[in-house]
Amino acid sequence: MAREYPLNKVRNFGIAAHIDAGKTTTTERILYYTGRTHKIGEVHEGAATMDWMEQEKERGITITSAATYCRWQDMQFNIIDTPGHVDFTAEVERSLRVLDGAVVVFDSGNGVEPQSETVWRQADKYGVPRIVFSNKMDKVGADFFMVVNDIEEKLGAKPIPVQIPIGAESSFQGIVDLVTMKAHIWSGEELGAKFDITDVPKELEEKAHAARSEMIELIADYSDDIMNNFMEGKESTAVQIKQAIRNATLQIKLIPVLCGTAFKNKGVQPMLDAVCDYLPSPLDRKAFKGINPVTSETDSREVDDKAPFSALAFKIQADPYIGKLTYLRVYSGTLESGSYVYNPIKDAKERISRIVRMHSNNREEVKSVNTGDIAAAVGLKNTGTGDTLCDEEKPILLESMDFPVPVIDVAIEPKSKADEEKLGIALNRLSEEDPTFRVRTNEETNQTIIAGMGELHLEILVDRMKREFNVQANVGRPQVAYRETIRKVQEAESKYIRQTGGRGQYGHVVLTVEPQDPGKGYEFVNKIVGGVIPREYIPAIDKGIKEAMTSGTLAGYPVADVKVVVIDGSFHEVDSSEMAFKIAGSMAFKDACRKASPVILEPIMKTEVIVPEEYMGDVIGDLNSRRGKIVSMESKNKVQHIKANVPLAEMFGYSTTLRSLTQGRGNYSMEPSHYEEVPSQIADKILERTTRG
């Protein structure tokens, strides 16, 4: 299919922020003003186009990232609206991995909030240029310049206001564009679709000129043209200023900051213009680097329709009508429906039966997609999240994505025999969709354990099982997802020999286990020389170790952060098999861990508590009693923002305690930070509990 828009006219961007900052409301206005929808869907009415899941409509929150596309001026926008709740941070992670830019929405009354910091770090990790939309300028306490200061102080970024507000709170009318020095004023009619562009109001002239001078000084550091004009006392043109801001934004040196109120329909159109002016096209991201899976050397792909095809699968979604949808970002080349693609991770070819472009949960079938496009493919049975798809003749392996480890476990069992098979299908389908949702079996109790990022995450998934898969299940109380690791290097040897007439079984493995840095995960190293164990049996040893890691030797929790090195062994010409080496590897690993000073790890939560100052002492005392470590305290408008690291095990039921301590005036948020060794007295209680029950 011929390209509709040249690549430099394409913008792939996401809308991201803390929960309740107004991301989905902003996206709904974008769809309305670009003509993609003909009426505005409101989140609080359960009518938002992008919140299509029943759970999203009922709760008024975004749970899954939703893709859409629209046109603005002479540009094509591919947009992903992401969740703001910390339990669904994986949706943000996978979206930012494949997007070229982002609009980060802040609440003008609250500034930079905890989940905003997480989103910012994720965008930094993938080098995503961004602009900021300071939303809710109409709310009580709205302060545009507080948001600007927060971006600098809390995020360590260089904000550059390219607008200033006209009024605030109930008197917010519009914005002054500091580049053109024109005012945009909304009268409130026609749902904000029309506004007046006028001269800067007299009472704001001095403030606007001062803000513009600051803006020019800031961008002069990143533009020779602007610096020369500044030194010579010349006025820079709007075109020069926009180009300078664009260049600095693409290098993530500056962050343009705009403002408005999406709910009151003010300020959205200038923000769309800023997406065109300042965020990158696929061409601005240059050639994409990867690894050649054949040679293991660095390779790259030009951002060009004529280059060999390469794409990243970033999301899997079960569709009740057409089966499994695999969302793709095309990095190079062209993909046609009916063609075959190569998956270097799985070393398999798969056929794309259909290609669809998504508008929330609606599909529009297309014959092909080109470089820079975001679409969904039907027919890929073996492709998972983070897999590369490419041309088999010119293979490449693109950078995948990392997902956080689940922190909460829940036991689940079917209510009846009829539900048993349906539960298995549901768990398999949901874990395929969501990389932060894990399923395992407790070897001691034979219970099925599901793990996720928080209570809300698991609650939503259980609800989906009931609604989408018609599974009735009993769910236990949420438990902390403890992990086990080791504290010293240990060698172990295991022989698996069975002789029961006919062909026997023989596998012999010698290995060492070593502690890894926290968060580094599992590493497998093969140091077998001279063929003492044939090469074809090495993957079986790795598989056996991975299976053994699901249940540690201390208390049966999954093992984390361990390096395993296979150093020796032997085989039998007739009796050796993959199964024998898998069992021998598993036995050797368990034996080594048992002797390597195993310890229990617990998830630590990065917690922020916001309380009126008069309750601060009680709240800090309570956090200390929960083994919390206070990181910082900040006073803002007679309200204390307390940041602390607290073990998740101590945070169950915290909302009730906080309500009681602050007479209902406190609130808090928390997100997984890292795992730490459990203090010995707590570990003893955990071990006692697991052995008893």
Curated annotation (Swiss-Prot):
- GO CC annotations? cytoplasm
Per UniProt, GTP binds at 17-24, 81-85, 135-138
Q: Give the keywords, sorted.
A: Cytoplasm, Elongation factor, GTP-binding, Nucleotide-binding, Protein biosynthesis
Q: Can you say where in the cell this protein is located?
A: Cytoplasm
UniProt cross-references to Gene3D superfamilies, sorted A to Z: 3.30.230.10, 3.30.70.240, Elongation Factor G (Translational Gtpase), domain 3 (3.30.70.870), P-loop containing nucleotide triphosphate hydrolases (3.40.50.300), Translation factors (2.40.30.10)
Q: What does this protein do?
A: Catalyzes the GTP-dependent ribosomal translocation step during translation elongation. During this step, the ribosome changes from the pre-translocational (PRE) to the post-translocational (POST) state as the newly formed A-site-bound peptidyl-tRNA and P-site-bound deacylated tRNA move to the P and E sites, respectively. Catalyzes the coordinated movement of the two tRNA molecules, the mRNA and conformational changes in the ribosome.
Q: What is this protein called?
A: Elongation factor G
The source organism is Endomicrobium trichonymphae
